[in-house]
Each structure stands twice: as structure tokens, then as C-alpha cells.
Amino acid sequence: MSSNQAEGLIIAAHGRHYTVELADGSLRQCFPRGKKNGPAVGDRVRITPQGRDEGAIEAVLPRRNLLFRSDEMRVKQFAANVDQLLIVVAVEPTFADDLTGRSLAGAWSADIEPVIVLNKIDLPNGLDAARARLEPLRRLGVPVIELSAQDHAMVHERLAPRLAGRTSLLLGQSGMGKSTLLNTLVPHAQAATREYSAALDMGRHTTTSTRLYHLPEPGGDLIDSPGFQAFGLQHLNGEQILRGFPEFAPHIEHCRFYNCTHRHEPGCGVLAALQAGQIDAGRYALYLRILDENAAARPY
């Protein structure tokens, strides 16, 4: 690294420009050189400072992982160097099982640990139904943390210890209470957003961008992303899709054919496990939907 360069952490992304936090806590609005794939929130980068508060991103430092989601048109980077994915669902309104399952598959395919946060447990009428819908995921070993985001003591008792010293990405459909949870965990979140906006003259764009916040004691980082209603996985190949369904793994070794797709082949260990009730039918149906979508998708 040359003497006029510095290393920093990307704490926000707004299209093709990024907010980079340097070691001294100062912020710079930076732009990547060239048109290759850009960095993501959570990336550590090397920049060349320019002017009072700008800079050019020269390189992205090696990352542990990178989480994507995609649609028919393009692949979108979520965040890099993530330790765990917090998927926020709620007792009310009804959450989408399909979206939850896709988020889990995206996390597992990127070697990121998923955690489900069941919010609004103070609404008892739908609690049993929500628990029942999450039970197949509990059986897979996915941690489910139940809380009410409006109960600060409960959040700090049940969730905060899991965040300490880790980088967590917060995802959730609109209406699940993700913003309330963020403001409970990071009391200065709204103030920080206004500060970044003023310092970098970002205006309204900051409200819809992915952003990293530093958690108060006992520490850790929390990445918040805008509410989403779709989580496409068209960027995954067949092997990566299977990593998103770890419960298939013990049965794949019993497949008769090495290139089995687990859809219709004779002697398929996964289909046998499905028929025996060892694989959840809803999860298997999601696997088929993802395969069909990816087969129909246009290449990027």
C-alpha cells in the first residue's frame, strides 16, 4: 500500500458510490475505479483519498464470503464478510415461508449461519401457528429466537449476546418489525443515518440503502438492508442450490446415479427420504421451484 492510500470499511452502499469508514472514524464517499463488479457493505477496501471527504476505491481486500440475491435481470450483492444472517419474521402479519426458505438457502450456499428471529410474540393469537410453521426449520438446527422488538430488555437478553463480536446481516419483509428491532439494538441508528447524510450530502438515498452500524457494548456490527419481497437465487448453480438444502446431504450418497437431480430418477436417495417423511415436503417443493426458475432464467 502506497503512502497516500488508506484502508477502510464500507459501511453503506448507494448505487456506484460507497461510504467508507477509515481507522480514525472519518467518513469518505468513494467510487470504485473501472466498471468491474463493485464492493459491498462489509468489505474492507484500499482507497486513495481525494479532496476533503472523497476517495477512489483501488482494491477490495480478500473477503470471507459474499451474499447475493438475484432476479431475472441482474445479480445484486447484499453484503460481505458476514458471520450470520438474521431473518426477521413475525407472528403478524403472516410471513412468507417461500421467502424465508430462499433466505436460508442463500445463506447456506454462502457458508453464512442463518438465525431466525420470531418477532411480536406479545401477540398470542398467532404465536402457535407461527411456531408450527417454523418447526421444520428448527428440526434442521436453525436457531429460532423469540422476542418482542418493543421489549428492550427481552431483545438485549435474548438476541444481543448472539451478536457480540460478530457481523450480522438483518433481513426481513416489510411489516415484520425489522426497523423497530434495529432501533432497539442500535439506539443511534436514525441519528447516524442523518449524520452520514449530512456529512456526505447523500439526502434521501440513505433511507433505502444497505448500511452497517457498530453495536454498543458488548460490540459487533449489524448490517441493515431495505425490506424486501423477493429473494431470487438464479445466480446459484446446481451444486450451490444443494448446499442450501443441507438435509438432503445424508441421502444423496444413496442415489443410484452420480448426476442425480433428485427430481425423478430411479434409485434417488432424496426421493426415498421424502417418501419416508425424512425430508419436509414444503422444503422439497421449494427446491424444485428454485431449480425450475434457474432453468428458465436467462444467463447473466
UniProtKB/Swiss-Prot annotation:
GO cellular component assignments: cytoplasm
Source domain of life: Bacteria
Top EC class of this enzyme: hydrolase
InterPro entries: G_CP_dom (IPR030378), NA-bd_OB-fold (IPR012340), P-loop_NTPase (IPR027417), Ribosome_biogen_GTPase_RsgA (IPR004881), RsgA_GTPase_dom (IPR010914), RsgA_N (IPR031944)
Entries under Pfam families matching the protein: RsgA_GTPase (PF03193)
GO biological process, one term: ribosomal small subunit biogenesis
SUPFAM superfamilies listed in its UniProt record: Nucleic acid-binding proteins, P-loop containing nucleoside triphosphate hydrolases
Binding site for Zn(2+): C255, C260, H262, C268
Cofactor binding remark: Binds 1 zinc ion per subunit.
Keyword set, alphabetical order: Cytoplasm, GTP-binding, Hydrolase, Metal-binding, Nucleotide-binding, Ribosome biogenesis, RNA-binding, rRNA-binding, Zinc
A GO molecular-function annotation: GTPase activity
Keyword rRNA-binding included in the entry's annotation: yes
PROSITE patterns: ENGC_GTPASE, G_CP
Keyword rRNA-binding: yes
Record-annotated CP-type G domain positions: 69-231
Family: Belongs to the TRAFAC class YlqF/YawG GTPase family. RsgA subfamily.
Subunit annotation: Monomer. Associates with 30S ribosomal subunit, binds 16S rRNA.
NCBIfam families listed in its UniProt record: ribosome small subunit-dependent GTPase A
HAMAP family xrefs: GTPase_RsgA
Name of the protein this chain belongs to: Small ribosomal subunit biogenesis GTPase RsgA
Origin species: Bordetella pertussis (strain Tohama I / ATCC BAA-589 / NCTC 13251)
